[in-house]
Amino acid sequence: MDGQPFTYTGLSFFNAIYNPAFNKSSEERIRWLEKFQKYGINVLRVWAQWDSRRGYADTCPECTVYFTDGRLRQPHVETLKQILVDAGKQKMAVELVFFSQESWHDNIRVGPEESARAITALSKELLPYRNVMFQVWNEFDERTLDHVKTMRAADPKRLVTNSPGGAGVVYYARGQGEALDYLTPHTTRQRTGRHWEIAPKELSYLLERYGKPVVDDEPARNGTPNFGGPAEKTYPSDQMIQIYKVWRLGAYITYHHDMIQTGYGTPAVPPSGVPDPEFSPYHRAVFEFIALRDRYSR
């Protein structure tokens, strides 16, 4: 960041733009950012499109930074800018997911011309904000290279990536892996087996093949079996072992969790809707390990 080496350490905070508690004020937002930093987090993975019908915390039909005709929803764009300003003050960054396969499969879709219009408009709005990376899709690959070209035309220096598919989909279509600045696959989860052994091998393959930074972008998590979650009980050590192995590879991590999927009023979701590192003993244990990255990653 700012021309200096940056050890990417992310957190899933998909609903950040649309969360009332996080956006109550700049002071409140910075309080949360400082708490994330305390536990080693320096990147938030945030979704521009949060309008699926799956009942996640803070989803709604208007919860997207663009209309389906490609025009921007300016109030949400302004909130995103405020997040970027406050994150920048803390030397933090945002990975912004443009399009969601969840919305696509709910038949909430943006056409080719409309998506190009939205990408171009938002890219130009965010030109002054250099602490945001663009991720084309969450777990999908539809016209990805076209979208990358549109992003680069509007902002040639912006870092761009893509998540090509769900758990275990770590291959990139021809030309895509080469075109991206860094790679963000969603590695194997519990249903395939011992993810803490399999996922690092998947990342190692990508590092060797493409020779560019790789982030374990949305790895196996705890909680509900829905939406790609585990069918059996999980333990904090499951995540810790995988994180440790990813670090030792020279790759980077994002902590993925169950603090959004089941919606407000359920035991897994904090009342604030913010992924609070101290919300449960399970999460706190993993976050405390992440905070010790310098100790264990060498």
Regions found by a protein language model. Name each.
Residues R117, R130-E288:
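Extracellular glycoside hydrolase catalytic/binding regions
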Residues D2-L180, H186-R189, G193:
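Active-site mouth of glycoside hydrolases
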Residues A285-R298:
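Terminal, non-catalytic domain-edge segments
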